[in-house]
């Protein structure tokens, strides 16, 4: 038997990367409900892995996300790294929780607040 096993409209057809994008989007939308004005113009992105040149403050540990401040004409940007999050997560449910925590931590960095101020449901143990 050759051909598709599942039609493209079935949720199981979606790739892990697509599902991860959805998790990050859900996390961003949840924060935008509270911080809409502060997050206006901020770009959010998902990349598979971080660049090989770590920032000076990253000491040997692979980053799960990164905040890039506005630079000239470029708007501020928050990037979540899919593969490191998936690798660090204990299971598939943990991926969503960890992605949420990464987004909260990076937004906190952007707003110069603690993660708990950004999202009272933030869990440091994620």
Positions of the model-derived regions?
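A metal-dependent hydrolase signature that marks the N-terminal structural subdomain at the beginning
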Residues: 1-70, 76
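Hydrophobic alpha-helical membrane-association signature
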Residues: 27, 99-103
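Active-site scaffold of zinc-dependent metalloenzymes
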Residues: 61-100, 110-126
């Amino acid at each position: 038997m050759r051909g598709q096993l599942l039609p493209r409209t079935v949720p199981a057809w979606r790739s892990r990367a697509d599902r991860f994008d959805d998790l990050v989007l859900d996390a961003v939308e949840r924060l935008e409900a509270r911080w809409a004005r502060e997050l206006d113009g901020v770009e959010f992105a998902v990349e598979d892995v971080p660049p090989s040149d770590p920032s000076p403050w990253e000491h040997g540990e692979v980053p799960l996300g990164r905040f890039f401040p506005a630079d000239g004409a470029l708007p501020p940007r928050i990037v979540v790294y899919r593969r490191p999050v998936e690798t660090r997560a204990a299971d598939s449910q943990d991926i969503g929780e960890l992605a949420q925590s990464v987004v909260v931590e990076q937004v906190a960095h952007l707003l110069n607040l603690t993660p708990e101020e950004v999202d009272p449901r933030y869990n440091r143990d994620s």
